[in-house]
């Protein structure tokens, strides 16, 4: 049994590496040093290294104001507040995004494929999409790191 477990763990580790999309050119491109200069340490880790913030810690998780959620890295509009809902997951959840600004990729980091969401303007990691969202709308749950977003209230939009 220990040998079988070890084999499984090595297999998962092997599957999680080298499966990411090759480097893609995005309209907004910065050096690592430039990203570090403009992003908070947490936003940098999430957007540039696909980290995940701790559940229930993000300032936008329970935001109920009307407005638009933009990429914290490049300010591209990603989500409208009318599609945000409380999934109970501890991260901001939306049943849909602004599709032309989202990129879908496959993430193998935990040993099996998940649908990763990225900003298609800067390539920043946002979170993942799951099929356990509200059945009366899209059935999708865009589970997004609060650190990957900035919020612009309706009265401040240009």
Language-model segment annotations:
Residues 13-33:
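Sec-dependent signal peptide cleavage junction
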Residues 26-27, 36-70, 76-158:
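A short Gly-Trp-Pro
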